[in-house]
A protein has these predicted regions:
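Negatively charged, low-complexity tracts enriched in Asp/Glu with abundant Ser/Thr
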Residues: 1-30, 63-87
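Amphipathic, interaction-prone secondary-structure segments
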Residues: 17-51
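Short, charged early-sequence alpha-helical segments and their helix-coil boundaries
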Residues: 48-65
Length: 87
């Protein structure tokens, strides 16, 4: 199932500030929803290195901002797109 353009835009508006705060060189590319509507795939890129981050769609809807940022940070660190925590 496809996300509506409005939903994609709202997800982008919510995620971009977190990505920029973690690393200003990270770029949000696209967001997709899996066929079972369980996971969001968030495609980001740093320099010439794209990566896909996974967010539980149901959890994302009600996830507090601090938890969302921590989730993004952890996945980016595992993928070696950012260094140690910037807290």
């Amino acid at each position: 199932m496809e996300l509506t353009p409005e939903r994609k835009r709202s997800i982008r508006q919510r995620l971009e500030p977190h990505l920029a705060a973690l690393d200003p060189t990270l770029h949000f590319i696209e967001v997709i929803l899996d066929s079972e509507r369980r996971n969001l795939g968030v495609i980001v890129q740093k320099d010439d290195r794209p990566a896909m981050l996974r967010l539980d769609f149901i959890r994302y809807v009600s996830m507090p901002e601090h938890e969302l940022r921590a989730t993004l940070e952890e996945q980016l660190r595992v993928k070696k797109l950012i260094g140690n925590s910037r807290k």
